[in-house]
Amino acid sequence: MIRDIYARSRNTYGVPRMVGQLHRRGHRVSRGRVARLMRANNLIGAHASNKWRRGRPDAGGVPDLLQRNFRADAPNQRWVADITEFVTGDGKLYLAAVRDLFHRGIVGWDTAGRQDAALVVSALTMALARTGHPTNVIHHADKGTQYTSLDFAFAAGNADMQLSFGSTGDAYDNAAMETFWARLKVEIAWIRGSIWFATRAEAHAYLFEFIEVFYNRQRHQPGLGHLTPAEYADKWRHDHGHQDLP
């Protein structure tokens, strides 16, 4: 049973997620016993230390509406966004993503060979289309020129969003995205043995499968009651009579 769950997690689950999945299947086992069984079978969860990057220069008078409170009571209340990069044989590939703080899923993303305003606008456009164009969403990001650009401000304004930026030089003000990037790269490296890709096309295809199939729909999270982001969002819609919402 433990080996099966571990394999289905793509060899990434550690003890907490393993315990949660066993409990979901009706097996009431202690954390200590699971830890011993995993050690005995050399089943190790994906792990690495986080590396925080520095923030960017100030962005006018736009306030920080989150103040490091990375929680939401419902979908589409608070989104966080950022850009990271991967090295490929074709050169760098930049990934921009938008994460919903309620169910922790990625609602919008895109990749490109340049980290410009068009990239973050594309990720935002996907997020809006996927979620039914909600209004009054808080969109929180760092002060990179992509997010402070006129193109992005125009796109966010057309969607009636509230823009929010962390304080200058403090990456912890966007910690929810920083931790996602750390887990993304740790687990990709754990599964593939490397985060290097031969081509940008290969990297994009792999990121599509990892984000859309594995992370959003298969990877269970202890903070969500050991549900996946998709399951957690579906449960909220069912409990609140919003099955018609995307």
State where each predicted segment sits:
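Charged DNA-binding/catalytic regions of mobile-element recombinases
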Residues: 1-246
